[in-house]
Swiss-Prot record:
Named cofactor requirement(s): Mg(2+)
Protein name: Holo-[acyl-carrier-protein] synthase
Keywords: Cytoplasm, Fatty acid biosynthesis, Fatty acid metabolism, Lipid biosynthesis, Lipid metabolism, Magnesium, Metal-binding, Transferase
Entry function: Transfers the 4'-phosphopantetheine moiety from coenzyme A to a Ser of acyl-carrier-protein.
NCBIfam families for the chain: acpS, pantethn_trn
Native organism: Helicobacter pylori (strain HPAG1)
Catalytic activity: apo-[ACP] + CoA = holo-[ACP] + adenosine 3',5'-bisphosphate + H(+)
Gene Ontology biological-process annotations: fatty acid biosynthetic process
E.C. numbers: 2.7.8.7
Gene Ontology CC entries for this record: cytoplasm
Binding sites annotated in the UniProt record for Mg(2+): 5, 51
One annotated GO molecular function: magnesium ion binding
Gene from which the chain derives: acpS
Pfam assignment, any one: ACPS
Compartment list: Cytoplasm
Amino acid sequence: MIGIDIVSIARVEKCVKRFKMRFLERFLSPSEIVLCKDKSSSIAGFFALKEACSKALQVGIGKELSFLDIKISKSPKNAPLITLSKEKMDYFNIQSLSASISHDAGFAIAVVMVSSLNR
């Protein structure tokens, strides 16, 4: 399955200015906040990546999957890596997750590909 999401960087910037850490803590873990380095483009990219993951899993953000169930880190080459807890990986029958984020013209776009186990 594939999920995709696009986010306005300016919209995220306004939310960060208005709600500060309270906004970030709704969807980012402490380590993800550090990775974003207060850059609106990175914050928007991480938000888009989590939304894209929820779409790839066909559940959206809600009871079955929260923003904080989705963990983002970076590879040694600074590429985004996405994981879920073992519990969620088993629940959704996931073998692997692949992710990509891009920024252009004031937008962040993210794509997530989910490979499922064949049981």
